[in-house]
Amino acid sequence: SLTVTSFFSMPVTRFVADQLYEERAERVLPSFAGACAVQLALGCGGYGAFLLASGATFCQGLLCLWLFAELVVCWTAMSYLTALKEYRGILIAFAAAVGAAFGAGWMLVFWLGVPVVEGFLAATALGYGVMLGLDVRLLCRFFPEREGSPWRFLRWVKRYRTLALTGLLLDLGLFAHLVIVWLGPLGVQVKGLFYGAPYYDVPALLAFLSILTTTA
């Protein structure tokens, strides 16, 4: 999801900054809907094809796709909110999402007896759903007026292609090492096309979570 949104993140941030400078804030929220639509179409198509060949069960595939779609919208919303310097709102949404995910995970797995993989996937998706809802609520509060084409931001993507490529290459640089480790001696096949490296993934995940609210 971060790879998909990384291509659009910097041009979108520039678009928001330009519209605010020109005092055309009513154009911002429509562009958020357009950016989400484009990224969801591209991302869900590609990730859906991966899931079909991945060996995941139907339920696991649906949960993964649901989580992926939520993440795309969350990362996009964070790009808009960081352009507004609304860091406090992002932090509150992140904390609420963590609490909801842990609570739902405990309830689903340890109380209701849902299988571990499906239960924790659903809990994570629920947590990010909370973050998504709070982020979108913040955006609607900042930009109550809506006017203009939802596709206007694409002009900025075309105009600032170097920014788009910079974002994409930055993301690949940040996460390519994970694929290298998964395919190396530490890597294990979890299921089908899903690979991991527990000795590396756990500290890498904790390090990522510690800077998550600053990555937009």
PLM-predicted stretches and their roles:
Residues A93-C140:
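Hydrophobic alpha-helical transmembrane segments
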Residues A123-P144, P150-A216:
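Transmembrane helical elements of multi-pass membrane transporters/channels
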Residues F8-G48:
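Membrane-water interface segments that mark the loop-to-transmembrane alpha-helix transition
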Residues Y21, A83-L84, F110-V114:
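Membrane-helix boundary and inter-helical linker elements of multi-pass secondary transporters
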Residues R27-V28, E86-A93, F120:
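Alpha-helical transmembrane segments and their helix-entry boundary regions
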Residues C36-L40, A49-L81, L91:
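Alpha-helical transmembrane segments of multi-pass membrane proteins
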